[in-house]
């Protein structure tokens, strides 16, 4: 029987975390927990209820009454209550404002508690900004993905074009730099590499190369 370890994958926006985490989870038959989708779902809740993204108390009060859940599938489905929000939380409106919502300490604390519950049984791959440092500090394998701003903007540009969104590469670079600044400098659970995390620069690597590297590291932990 496969040892059910916890794998934490952190890194900045568009570093390839979610794509790689899904592949790793599928290969290991682990559960994938998309914490970014949880923050996006909370941002969507604020938008839907006309609550300002800066209104921490208002959003926190709504979150207390809201169930966010995942359902497996070829593409993992995300639900807010009974509403499937898988597509809408990837909209540009949500993408451009999620860092504001994610910077609120009470929101991070509430979601971190939920994320820790997901991980109690092990056998999970969780990606985000503070998984290895705050959510799962005892994860058996911690990965920190990096890539240049130019490469990340290019990836996001291709993603947007594939979804039919008009794209401006220079604007995307600017947005990613702004998102990095917010993520790295926020007071509560900023984006940073855990001391025991393994850094992987994905700038010149394919998705499969990154996934295979993490799988090799995971196999060492599982078989140890």
UniProtKB/Swiss-Prot annotation:
PANTHER family from the UniProt entry: CYTIDYLATE KINASE, CYTIDYLATE KINASE/PANTOATE-BETA-ALANINE LIGASE
Reactions accelerated catalytically: CMP + ATP = CDP + ADP; dCMP + ATP = dCDP + ADP
UniProt-listed CDD domains: CMPK
Pfam family name, one: Cytidylate_kin
Record-given protein name: Cytidylate kinase
E.C. number(s) listed in UniProt: 2.7.4.25
Gene Ontology MF, one: dCMP kinase activity
């Amino acid at each position: 029987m496969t040892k059910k370890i916890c794998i934490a994958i952190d890194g900045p926006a568009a570093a390839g975390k979610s794509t790689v985490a899904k592949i790793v989870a599928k290969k290991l038959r682990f559960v994938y927990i998309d914490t970014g989708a949880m923050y996006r779902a909370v941002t969507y809740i604020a938008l839907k209820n006309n609550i300002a993204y800066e209104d921490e108390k208002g959003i926190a009060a709504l979150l207390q009454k809201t169930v966010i859940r995942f359902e497996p599938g070829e593409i993992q489905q995300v639900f807010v209550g009974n509403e499937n929000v898988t597509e809408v939380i990837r909209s540009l409106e949500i993408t451009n404002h999620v860092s504001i919502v994610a910077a609120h300490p009470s929101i991070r604390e509430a979601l971190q508690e939920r994320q820790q519950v997901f991980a109690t049984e092990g056998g999970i791959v969780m990606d985000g900004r503070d998984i290895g440092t705050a959510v799962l500090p005892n994860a058996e394998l911690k990965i920190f993905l990096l890539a240049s701003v130019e490469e990340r903007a290019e990836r996001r540009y291709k993603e947007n074009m594939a979804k039919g969104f008009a794209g401006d590469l220079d604007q995307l670079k600017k947005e990613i730099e702004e998102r990095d600044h917010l993520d790295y400098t926020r007071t509560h659970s900023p984006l940073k590499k855990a001391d025991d995390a393994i850094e992987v620069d994905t700038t010149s690597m394919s998705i499969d190369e990154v996934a295979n590297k993490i799988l090799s590291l995971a196999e060492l932990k599982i078989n140890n």
